């Protein structure tokens, strides 16, 4: 299946924001549960453990990555069911991520943002988040999970061009 990338880059004072969106026919509260309840995050990203809350660190398993590593994720800000901001550090660096939900007439838009200090590796990062957000969609609507090779290297040139124009 051919996937169409939707990521965009916006300049910021410290680099760029990578922004991707998905739309759901569901309430913000229901989509929020898919982002914050361990048994539901396990369906598209991985389970988590710990006592979640602003300023606290939880452990998240990246269940769909090679070797299914666990990583520490710090909850920076949490405004249920509208906004979740987290940071995590792994072998690739420091990740600053935000999930923002906006609901209107029973439809919720998820706006995912990753703050990037550099555009190095944006082709891999962008394709990875396209994959994970489509995993979220599949987990919610019961469609088959996508395969990562539908995203990378397939979306590489899109994100490389995006970075060149940024």
Task: List PLM regions with ranges.
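A conserved amphipathic terminal alpha-helix motif
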Residues: 2-3, 116-166
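Beta-strand/loop substructures that line and gate deep hydrophobic ligand-binding cavities in soluble
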Residues: 15-17, 87-140
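Hydrophobic ligand-binding cavity/cleft-lining segments
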Residues: 1-48
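Short, surface-exposed charged micro-motifs
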Residues: 8-10, 49, 74, 96-100
């Amino acid at each position: 299946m051919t996937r169409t990338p939707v990521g965009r880059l916006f300049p910021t004072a410290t680099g760029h924001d990578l922004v991707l969106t998905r739309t759901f026919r569901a309430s913000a509260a229901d989509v929020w549960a898919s982002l914050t309840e361990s048994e539901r995050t396990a369906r598209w990203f991985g389970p988590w453990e710990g006592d979640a809350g602003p300023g606290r660190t939880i452990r998240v398993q990246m269940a769909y990555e090679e070797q299914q590593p666990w990583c520490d994720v710090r909850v920076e800000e949490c405004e249920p069911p509208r906004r979740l901001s987290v940071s995590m550090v792994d072998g690739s660096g420091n990740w600053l991520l935000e999930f923002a939900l906006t609901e209107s007439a029973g439809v919720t838009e998820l706006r995912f943002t990753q703050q990037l200090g550099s555009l190095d590796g944006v082709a891999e990062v962008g394709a990875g988040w396209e994959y994970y957000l489509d995993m979220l969609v599949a987990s919610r609507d019961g469609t088959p999970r996508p395969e990562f090779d539908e995203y990378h290297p397939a979306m590489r040139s899109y994100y490389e061009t995006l970075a060149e124009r940024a």
